[in-house]
Amino acid sequence: QVKLTLGEIRSIQVNVMGEVVVPGTYTLSSFASVFHALYRAGGVNPIGSLRSIKVIRNGNTIADLDVYDLLMKGKMKDDIRLQDGDVILVDPYQSLVQILGKVKRPMFYEMKPTETVGTLLKYSGGFTGDAYKKALRIIRKSGREHQIYNVDEMDYSVFRVDDGDKITVDSVLQRFENRVEIRGAVYREGLYQLDGTMNTVKQLIKKAEGLRGDAFLNRAIIDRELEDLSHEVIQVDVKGLLNGTAADIPLQKNDILYIPSIHDLK
């Protein structure tokens, strides 16, 4: 026969110092880890570092915990079991930056000196679907004023962020590279793709499933946006175009073709 006797779990005393909500000496279970001690101390305060939480044992630093490893990667390699007399020291953060705009987790992040824009983008969850990914903008304090840096995509992995930086990721422009539109007396009004198989007025009318019976064939117009954002109006002989007596008209991006109804003329 084997007889087991359960004894009491041994307690240890740990000092939690520095930038925590309630610094002091805490009595913990001998199975307690660094996170248990931080929880008892109320967590890190607003100026405390989450990137470098030191465990000091017998005067030597035996672990340097980066909470981001747990939050971002699920790693807990430095959340070691504590021993009696251990000291947990939380220093003030060194670098706090803010990322705004079209990322999945826009907020403040604590960054290490060697970390880059690319690292920050990973922490923030990456771009949203409507983000402009080719470049971003950084506002940085410089003495008594600020400076703006436009960082291109190729430099994300090498451009280091600095304390106080404000990074903004813009959205893509609300413009289209290959859009045309048809309105009026056709069966399917709306937006269409300008491509190799559909790039003329006649082809657009066909794509819209043709003209309705009330379409006015003697005149239609194209509203065309020019490079200076002014507009040009082009007259279209729809009847001549369909019977082959008038040349088809090539379309350009953002053209809007209006086919009036005979009822509009009354």
Q: What annotation goes with each model-predicted range?
A:
Residues 1-266:
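Ser/Thr/Pro/Gly-biased, low-complexity, turn-/loop-rich segments
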